[in-house]
Amino acid sequence: MRESMEFDVVIVGGGPAGLAAAIRLKQIDAGINVCLIEKGSEIGAHILSGAVMDPRAITELFPDWQAQGAPLETAVSRDRMTFLTRHGFVDLPVFALPSCFKNHGNYIISLGQVCRWLGTQAEALGVEVYPGFAGAEVLYDENGAVRGIATGDMGLTRNGQPGPGHQPGMELSLIHI
């Protein structure tokens, strides 16, 4: 039998969207009980890419993100679009770039570092963050409404059978449906 914990909100995934949602919920109502699960061993463990980030979203969450030490350190200094050809390359003039390729005011970041920082901020606001737990199943009530999620079992053999250290997954149930 699975153990169960109850929350007002359960968020599956500790990427930028899940973390931003958890943070915003706690900023709006500090009393709300928010849980975030992440399949990786730590927040940011499964996010390996770099990115160019527009700081608008993080500014909306944390207007003083620079003073708080957010890892947005390298401002984009110039834009360049290069087409590689069989015999070399051709630079496209910057004025010909579509606006979606222009990155003035943006930052070159490690998305994993940003997620780790957001995870720290979420925990400081009172979000219960559980790394190392994958969401395995959506749980429904008798009317077909979502009532929570179940995490995956731990200690399974390679055939998917319970092994000697088997622990059933947890039910993370919603208090208000």
Language-model features, listed with the residues they occupy:
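A short, basic/flexible loop-to-alpha-helix module at the beginning of a structural domain
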Residues: 1-6, 166-169
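N-terminal Rossmann-like FAD-binding beta1-loop-alpha1 element of flavoenzymes
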Residues: 9-33
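Glycine-rich FAD pyrophosphate-binding loop
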Residues: 26-47
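N-terminal FAD cofactor-binding segment of flavoenzymes
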Residues: 40-87
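A structured beta-alpha segment of the ubiquitous adenosine-cofactor-binding alpha/beta core
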Residues: 100, 151-173
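Short beta-strand to alpha-helix junction loop
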Residues: 101-120
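A conserved short coil-to-beta-strand element within the FAD-binding core of flavoproteins
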Residues: 132-145
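Conserved small/polar residues in nucleotide/adenosyl-binding loops
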Residues: 175-177
